[in-house]
Amino acid sequence: MQRDICRGLGAAALAALLPSAAAEAHGFAGDRFFPATILTDDPFVASEASLPTVTLNPTQSDGSRELDIGPDLSMLITPNWDFTIGSDWQHIRSPGMPTVTGWGGLNTGTQYQLFINAPHEAMALAGLNVNWANTGSQAVGAPDFTTLSPTIDFGKGFGDLPDSLPWLRPFALTGNLSFDFPTKTQSMGMLNPNVFNYGFAIEYSIPYLQGEVRDIGLGPPFNRMIPLVEFALSSPFNRGFSGTTTGTVQPGVIWAGPYFQVGAEMIIPTNSLSGHGIGGVVQLHFYLDDLFPNGIGRPISQW
């Protein structure tokens, strides 16, 4: 995702060392299909859209509860480089207080596919996400400062394990590492810390099991299901917030078709700072590059 001559030189060097990222279809590394996970980011660039994602968050320590409904769009600029944009409409209910609604801040991002290694079912990308200042409603807590978040996303399938471990080969692991850098150290009387974000997803692909390991006779809709558990944690590390890690664990399942997928997960807080009780999220997600390969799903440039 570099924006100058260095990007061209870096991409050329990677192309000489690694298998071509552009040669693979949406979310594939060899025989491995990586679905678009709900909580953590995908390790591949693509033209795709989540329309919508609906999230009922666990109850917070002050008794408030938030419902988020939001679209998210990703478009390929080149076969290895994309741009993302999204936001959430938020509905927050607090005990003894009026309900507040409004849009959260605008989020954009850009990602560059570092490599896709088909024989080892591995891929990774580097990106930069931005949460923009003054682009949402203050009533729902949209920030008045911009946050820059460089990120690394990766995925690894276990299909290259030996044949003596057949039932482990459908497993895959994806993950994210990122840092948040707010452009203001303080706003509205509150300090804004830097934050280390880390998350991963453990997946077990029924399509991979039946197509690449052993057909166990599952028919529709189970033959396209991918059970998974996602984990995401955020750890501030300065400005008085050290030791206040929050996060969620989200077990669920994704049904992945040729042109779209449907996913649902429970939301379980990791500690009292993250809330209490159980939440949930559902998502309808479209593969635009497969739906419209000669239209809006096509990269703007083939460079």
Task: Outline where the language-model segments fall.
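Bacterial N-terminal signal peptides that target proteins for export
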Residues: 1-10
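Transmembrane beta-barrel domains of Gram-negative outer membranes and organellar outer membranes
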Residues: 25-303
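Short coil/turn motifs at helix boundaries and re-entrant loops, enriched in small/polar
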Residues: 14-17, 269
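Short non-domain terminal segments
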Residues: 3-4, 15-16, 32, 229
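Short N-terminal leader segment in a subset of presequences, especially plant chloroplast
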Residues: 9-11, 33-34
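C-terminal segment of classical bacterial N-terminal signal peptides
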Residues: 16-24
